């Protein structure tokens, strides 16, 4: 059964969980999980909204901790909405089954030639051909998609990446008894790790001192690898810290961040215990400024 999707949407003051099981009957032993989340959370045990049924971090962590199988995470940064559009579209292509699957190597080559030789100029037609190859149940189709993804037309680059991923999952689910789990996020990931963007502010909106900047850089560089996390980017601004890092799928993101923030605050209590985490997109400088200026929780030093 191919499931589309467990979609988590978490906001500052709300938590909603939407599950749809709508596409795919011919892809055995595979699950599609779309995760789109933004949290603003408070370090420690003080925030009531993080309790019981409203503990969105707990729901997020447990949803993956209970999953067993081979995780696939798209490395490219493709909007979740486009990813879900792709899988719904490819489900219809599988259902139509025209030409009948599995496709022969010759059929795959003909489709690929049509993509390359300019006979197809419309974006929708290119999308259709890519989805046909993705659902071909053919190793040759996978190799052709792999080749095309390296030089895809800009208007279908994301679609080609999705087609390549689907083809890989389809083949692995066909030849392996292990469950295949595809995790879709806006920021993507690497291997079996999800990419998160984190915004942390200084306590009381006070500018960081030099020793505090050094402490942040050293503590994060030391602490995060202890949980098998990888820092891709850390930038310490005047009043805020931006972190982009990779986290193992089954790791508790909140626990990891709480621990390193607490360690930093042993040296002067200068990081706010409220921070923002998302796997949708990086925040722009304008969005960061808006958070600093409008969020009441940062207007006091308490």
Where are these regions (language model features)?
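Extended repeat-based scaffolds of very large eukaryotic assembly and lipid-transport proteins
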Residues: 50-127
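Short, intrinsically disordered low-complexity segments
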Residues: 226-285
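Long, charge-patterned amphipathic interaction tracts in eukaryotic proteins
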Residues: 154-229
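Positions within the helices of HEAT/ARM-like alpha-solenoid repeats
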Residues: 121-125, 141, 155-156
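Amphipathic alpha-helical scaffolding segments comprising HEAT/armadillo-like alpha-solenoid repeats
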Residues: 70-74, 104-116, 138-150, 173-178
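Structural detector for internal amphipathic alpha-helices that build alpha-solenoid repeat scaffolds
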Residues: 85-102, 125-137, 147, 158-170
């Amino acid at each position: 059964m191919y499931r589309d999707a467990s979609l988590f949407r978490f906001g500052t003051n709300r938590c909603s969980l939407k599950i749809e099981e709508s596409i795919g009957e011919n892809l055995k032993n595979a699950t599609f999980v779309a995760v789109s989340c933004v949290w603003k959370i408070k370090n420690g045990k003080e925030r009531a909204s993080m309790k019981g049924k409203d503990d969105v971090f707990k729901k997020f962590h447990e949803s993956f901790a209970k999953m067993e199988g081979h995780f696939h995470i798209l490395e490219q940064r493709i909007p979740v909405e486009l990813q879900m559009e792709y899988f719904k579209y490819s489900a219809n292509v599988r259902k139509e089954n025209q030409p009948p699957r599995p496709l022969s190597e010759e059929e795959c080559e003909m489709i690929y030639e049509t993509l390359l030789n300019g006979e197809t100029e419309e974006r929708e037609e290119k999308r259709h051909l890519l989805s046909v190859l993705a659902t071909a149940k053919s190793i040759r189709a996978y190799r052709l998609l792999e080749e095309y993804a390296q030089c895809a037309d800009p208007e279908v680059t994301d679609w080609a990446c999705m087609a390549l991923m689907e083809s890989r999952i389809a083949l692995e689910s066909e030849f392996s008894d292990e469950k295949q789990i595809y995790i879709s996020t806006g920021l993507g990931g690497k291997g079996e790790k999800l990419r998160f963007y984190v915004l942390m502010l200084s306590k009381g909106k006070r500018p960081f001192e030099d020793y505090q900047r050094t402490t942040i850089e050293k503590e994060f560089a030391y602490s995060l690898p202890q949980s098998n996390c990888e820092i891709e980017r850390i930038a310490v601004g005047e009043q805020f810290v931006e972190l982009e890092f990779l986290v193992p799928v089954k790791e508790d993101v909140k626990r990891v961040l709480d621990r390193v923030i607490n360690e930093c605050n042993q040296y002067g209590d200068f990081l706010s215990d409220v921070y923002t985490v998302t796997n949708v997109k990086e925040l722009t400088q304008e969005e960061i400024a808006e958070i600093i200026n409008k969020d009441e929780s940062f207007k006091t030093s308490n």
